[in-house]
Design a protein with these regions (language model features):
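A short glycine-rich, His/Asp/Glu-containing loop-to-beta-strand
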Residues: 1-7, 97-139
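Short glycine/proline-enriched turns and hinge-like loops at secondary-structure junctions
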Residues: 10-11, 53-55, 135
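Compact recognition or signaling/catalytic modules
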Residues: 113-122, 130-175
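A short beta-strand-loop-beta hairpin characteristic of the jelly-roll/cupin
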Residues: 8-37, 138-163
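Beta-strand-enriched, solvent-exposed domains that form extended recognition/catalytic surfaces
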Residues: 1-3, 18, 23, 57-58
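A short hydrophobic beta-strand segment most commonly corresponding to one strand
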Residues: 54-74
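Segments adjacent to and within acyl-thioester-processing domains across lipid
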Residues: 70-99
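Conserved metal-binding segment of the jelly-roll/cupin
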Residues: 35-53, 64, 161-175
């Protein structure tokens, strides 16, 4: 609700905050960031973040728990700078051979920014289809924005998916 504040303290995880709707202010590490649109915001895992709703806001939080040694990997190999911020409309767009020409795929958090994690989106309009495919070494979660309604085929079984739903695609499943 407008005026609400949430404080997230450092844990053994990354707080991946996806603003779905509304206006929000993030305060972390002595800086403030204000957004009025869809955005992904990931504070440093060792930083406290205050989240203030400037309007009625909807945020999806993913807590991605760290494994031993990943802090060293972040510093040495990934060189990720926090907070990690990706405005949705500015996310890198790409084409996928399994998807139609009217489908827009976006990379919201590229791989090798947070160990074992990447975040993308698929956007289309009207009737559309994606060819069945699998990811033999990848678990996936699908989140449907509020303007979406679809059926997702998982291992050839239709699963209805409506607005603001999170769906788990098990490791190696055909979808």
């Amino acid at each position: 609700l407008k005026g609400s504040t949430l404080k997230l303290v450092p844990e053994n995880c990354h707080h991946i905050l996806i603003v779905l709707k509304g206006d929000v202010r993030f305060a972390t590490d002595g800086n403030e960031y204000v957004f009025h649109e869809r955005v992904v915001f990931v504070p440093g895992p060792d930083q406290t973040v205050a989240v203030e709703a400037l309007s009625n806001v909807q945020i999806l939080e993913i807590r991605w728990f760290k494994r031993e040694g990943e802090d060293d990997q972040l510093a040495a190999e990934y060189k990720t700078q926090f907070p990690l911020i990706q405005i949705y409309r500015n996310s890198k767009q790409y084409r996928d051979r399994n998807k139609s020409d009217k489908t827009i795929s976006r990379s919201c958090i590229d791989q090798r920014r947070i160990p074992r994690f990447a975040l993308g989106s698929v956007e289309s309009y009207g009737v559309d289809a994606v060819k069945s495919h699998d990811h033999p070494m990848l678990d996936q979660f699908f989140f449907s924005f509020e303007e979406n309604e679809m059926d997702v085929l998982i291992d050839y079984e239709a699963v209805p998916m409506g607005a603001n739903e999170l769906l788990y695609i098990p490791l190696g499943s055909i979808h």
